[in-house]
């Protein structure tokens, strides 16, 4: 059994591709089942017993515990075909952007991701919650077995250790904070701007918190469910509107921050063109934090619109990285120690079937000799003589296999067994 992590992220693929292979949160369980089924197809030489999928705005990754007779390259191909088939994309479009990490590299990657070392925002905490959600869904879908369950439990423990014993998350600039900084390049005073947030999830809540600190002129939450939008808007003394109201009200807002789970764009080119015309070409600042994107990319070409995606925010969120290099080194050292510990556990698991076979074989021998002793006792034989025969019979049966193997071996094989048997039976020789 081998562990494998296959996927793409913000360092290997642009948002235009990442959004095509993103899995909606409510489809992760179904996707895990599909992945396991795909790996087990008769035309595939790889079979996965366990699988989990992590899908965020910055990455889509499949973790698997599989038999891999074809090696890593075959695993990449099979996973790429699965992703392409599931999302109805050309295989050739995905293959160059994928990475595949086997065994200890897969474990190390999972530990680094959960600890925030592989994030666009170094040390950001949201990824840990996202990974926990992915694992819960994989478990509910039957995707977790002995290996992935143990790996993810250790992953969460490592992430907790890294975050509690290092400064990896200190002074990091989040996407939400970067959005505020960028908007201040367009508008001198946020306090004079009307801000619209589309969605009501964690990212929007974080963004609204950062913008609220700048005392904007107004705050509005647009959400598919009005009640949920109202709950969030109340926290920021704002109002809530329905997504259906956006075409008529978009022109009222100077700053638009969007992050929903929609699989299709919510704001189209025509809607923004009409809004800009109604605003008499007053600039509009827009940040699309969603993957797949909520705002059509073509909108960024409009003269009076400043549109940024998660990839565009990358340079802003690197602030303070240099100051955290010592924390990174500490975190990497912790991770390396924990990877070695986990791989030792993996190696130990490999001999479990051998140990089980030994127990079963010994139990069979024991039952044979015990039954023979019971029959002798039933005939009235002397108990000491029966016990003596029982002990000798067990000894003979236990040693028969090793003795026969040693007698039948020749040359180097006999020398190897002769050196090994004293270690196994802890004799003096």
Swiss-Prot record:
Chain sites annotated for binding substrate: 56-59, 119, 124-126, 130
Protein name: Glutamyl-tRNA reductase
Gene that produces this protein: hemA
Keyword Nucleotide-binding: no
Matching PROSITE patterns: GLUTR
Entry remark concerning the domains of this protein: Possesses an unusual extended V-shaped dimeric structure with each monomer consisting of three distinct domains arranged along a curved 'spinal' alpha-helix. The N-terminal catalytic domain specifically recognizes the glutamate moiety of the substrate. The second domain is the NADPH-binding domain, and the third C-terminal domain is responsible for dimerization.
Family, as annotated: Belongs to the glutamyl-tRNA reductase family.
Domain of life from the UniProt record: Bacteria
Species assigned in the record: Janthinobacterium sp. (strain Marseille)
Active-site residues annotated for this sequence: 57
